[in-house]
Design a protein with these regions (language model features):
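Left-handed beta-helix
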Residues: 23-26, 31-199, 374-728
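Short, low-complexity, intrinsically disordered N-terminal modules
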Residues: 6-7, 20, 29
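Domain-scale recognition of functional cores that engage charged ligands
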Residues: 170-207, 215-496
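Positively charged N-terminal leader segments that act as targeting/secretion signals
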Residues: 12-22
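Intrinsic disorder
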Residues: 2-4
Length: 728
């Protein structure tokens, strides 16, 4: 049993009022989940306890005031039993607010007080620890108030644990969706790409960047401290920079076509995990906000939530130290509304938004996002999924059309179902055709198109969409410095399942070819141009899926496709294991392949060579590369003005190469271990660097050996082939 007794101590001539927490184990958690080995044979949670918590959570949700919530908690028999032998004055210090009292009693009601408020023998920091844990509990209680606060959070976790063993017997049909194949460049798709460019000023971008990246084991090389996914360097840029540069490339394309500079507002949902929020702020400051106005970004932080073990208990890292993890990206909508993100975007005339995740760096390749958003804009859709083929039996969610019949007719919902729920919904993961390795259901990629008003209207109906739990073995550090591994879960949620509330109703059943009548939509594209994630560290001999190495091979597959099929280059054959050459480019070079093919035409790249084009304005034809070539402009898209804002088109560097041969020793073989990071050691390299608005021209020349050509601003340099070599 818990009680707080008052002790007065004097320290450094100051008097402190200390509230010491004591526990007895006679009132313990009555809400226990059995181990998974037991749950496979019997229900994992006592039904009576589930019903009690469900009713308590519902009552807490419906309460109209904090006083009413407190009355509900005081009436709970677990709370009553807890206070049978002590008064409220003994249990709670006067400094605890009524909200804090409700939070503590909520923890008592769910049976976790004996863990959350446990005090180590001889502890001296009790009051500070209590204050800290109360702050966390209050944040959880407030954020999840729409589902019953702390009680609703805990009930959701254990009820999901129990329901994961049940079969959903609703009379619903799950139908493969019919979407627009944007890989087929027919007139409809080309028109929508054009719309995606022309109407970019109507669009905002929202990024979920709070990923913990536990499985990547990302650490600061100097301090050893863990780092969030946004800090991972991939193909020469951090994952956060990749997302921002992608949108800048589309803005730059709009500028080149229409002569108008746009600044797309970007909202970033961060998290508290691994100091993610502060890391994102630091990264933005280091990059000087990527040459964008500081006010064009809106950072909002998702709450961390208590982790729960297989026994249904909250996990602790020390005395009154909860193990906290991000609560899933499904909170993005409620959090965005609560923090004013929607209002901020609407004030800027943005009614639609593109949503992306931090761990998928290839989504901006070519014209996929422009076609996707173009369809959503031209057809005024309220929600969209950018989808692609999915391997049968892969651990990925699927996009489905859910059909349900009732007395009013037929209802349809284009949505997502996570792979861990297939059994629950009796979904069979079958191939699209006999012998195919691809599923009949396409992959959910978490690339979304949203109508802000429609989403805002549905948040109250579904504040935490797609609730789920997923147990994972997780290592964490205890306060004594030790490393502990537990199989844990927390209440997660999925942002894409806000679509569950976007239902279309018809009097008659619809044929698949009529699904275009939905207010939602789906596109198909090639998988390697849609999604390839970086979620975990590669283990030698293990699968490449979801590793940086695997993602880079998809990145290289796209580069191979671009050069061979669009730019008409002769390149080495594609290797499924290791890149046979390296090619990286700034997205502003296109980003459309059709535009890049106008700037880079006909040539040859020899095996093991590396071509890096960190420039937008180039004219390359007949290049023969055997070794390493890097062309970099200080001003890729323009010049930064006195306010630190990038002005598109002002003083960009330019380069023209016609029938140029580059020969050098190229990449050092021992530098290819972490090739996916994009930083190589070169035995020799030909590097052309253009300061500010500098220009470099070369025609019918051979650039041999290691060369460093720096062209000063305001200067045009021409390379000329002579008998004794090249002169400039």
């Amino acid at each position: 049993m818990l009680y707080l007794s008052r002790d007065i101590i004097v320290k450094k001539n100051r008097t402190y009022l200390i509230y010491v927490v004591f526990f007895f184990q006679d009132v313990d958690c009555q809400c226990r989940v059995k181990s998974m080995s037991d749950t496979e044979k019997s229900p994992s949670v006592l039904l009576e306890e589930l019903d009690r918590l469900r009713l308590l959570a519902c009552n807490m949700k419906e309460a109209r005031s904090i006083q009413e919530r407190l009355e509900i908690l005081n009436a709970d028999h677990i709370v009553k039993e807890f206070f049978k032998n002590q008064s409220l004055d003994q249990a709670f210090p006067s400094e605890v607010s009524i909200e804090g009292e409700a939070a503590i009693k909520s923890v008592i009601a769910i049976g976790q007080a004996g863990r959350v408020f446990a005090v180590s023998a001889g502890a001296l920091e009790v009051s500070d620890r209590l204050r800290d844990v109360l702050e966390i509990l209050l944040r959880v209680d407030r954020f999840y108030s729409s589902i019953g606060g702390i009680v609703g959070y805990h009930w959701s976790v254990i009820s999901l644990f129990a329901s994961s063993l049940e079969i959903n017997c609703d009379k619903r049909s799950f139908i493969p969706p019919v979407g627009i194949d944007i890989a087929m460049k027919n007139r409809e798709v080309l028109d929508n790409i054009a719309v995606g460019i022309e109407r970019i000023k109507e669009l905002a971008e929202i990024y979920a960047v709070g990923g913990a990246a536990d499985r990547l084991r990302l650490q600061d090389p100097e301090t050893g401290m863990p780092l969030p996914a946004a800090r991972l360097t991939f193909a020469g840029k951090t994952l956060l920079e990749t997302l921002v540069v992608d949108v800048q490339a589309r803005e730059y394309l709009y500028f080149k076509l229409f002569g108008e500079q746009l600044t797309t507002p970007i909202a970033l949902m961060t998290s508290e995990e691994k100091e993610n929020h502060q890391q994102i702020l630091s990264l933005c400051n280091e990059q000087k906000w990527f040459g964008r106005p500081r006010g064009s970004f809106f950072l909002f932080c998702q709450p961390s939530v208590p982790a729960v073990d297989r026994e249904g208990n909250w996990c602790m890292t020390g005395m009154m130290r909860l193990l906290l993890k991000p609560g899933g990206h499904g909170v993005i909508w409620k959090l965005a509304k609560d923090c004013g993100v929607f209002d901020w975007l609407l004030e800027q005339g943005r009614k639609k938004a593109l949503v992306r995740q931090i761990n998928n760096p290839i989504a901006g390749i070519d014209d996929g996002l422009l076609a996707f958003t173009g369809i959503g804009l031209s057809q005024d859709k309220v929600f969209g999924f950018a989808s692609c083929p999915r391997q049968v039996k892969s651990a990925e969610g699927i996009n489905v059309v859910v059909e349900k019949q009732d007395n009013s007719g037929f209802s349809y919902c284009l949505t997502n179902i996570e792979y861990c729920d297939f059994k629950k919904h009796q979904i069979t993961d079958e191939p699209a055709a006999p012998g195919s390795t691809y599923s009949k259901f396409p992959s959910n990629t978490n690339i979304l198109f949203v109508d802000l008003a429609a989403i805002s209207k549905n948040i109250d109906k579904m504040p935490i969409p797609g609730r789920l739990i997923n147990f994972k073995k997780t290592e964490f550090q205890t306060e004594d410095g030790g490393i502990k591994e537990l199989e844990i879960c927390r209440l997660e949620s999925t942002m894409q399942n806000i679509a569950d509330e976007l239902i279309d109703t018809f009097s008659q059943s619809l044929a698949a070819e009529d699904f275009f009548r939905f207010k939602t939509f789906l596109t198909y594209n090639k998988r390697h141009k849609t999604i390839s994630t970086v979620k975990k560290e590669y283990v030698i001999g293990g699968p490449l899926l979801e590793t940086p190495e695997g993602c880079y091979l998809d990145f290289f597959r796209n580069a191979h496709d671009l050069l061979s099929n669009y730019c008409r280059f002769s390149v080495p054959d594609f290797d499924e294991c290791v890149p046979s050459f390296f090619f990286t480019y700034h997205p502003a070079l296109g980003p459309l392949y059709s535009i890049i093919a106008q700037k880079v035409r006909v040539g040859k790249i020899h095996p093991g060579s590396a071509l890096e084009l960190n420039i937008a304005e180039v004219d390359i034809e007949g290049l023969d590369l055997q070794g390493s070539l890097r062309i970099a402009a200080e001003n890729v898209m323009g010049e930064v003005d006195g306010l630190g804002v990038l002005q598109y088109g002002r003083g960009s560097g330019k380069c023209q190469l016609k029938n140029v041969v580059v020969q050098n020793l190229g990449i050092s073989l021992d530098s290819q271990r972490d090739f996916w990071r994009g930083s190589f050691k070169h035995e020799e390299i030909c590097e052309i660097f253009l300061e500010k608005d500098a220009e470099f021209l070369a025609e019918n020349v051979t650039l041999a050996g290691g060369l460093s050509i720096v062209v000063p601003r305001g200067t045009r340099v021409r390379a000329v082939q002579g008998k004794d070599g090249v002169s400039f």
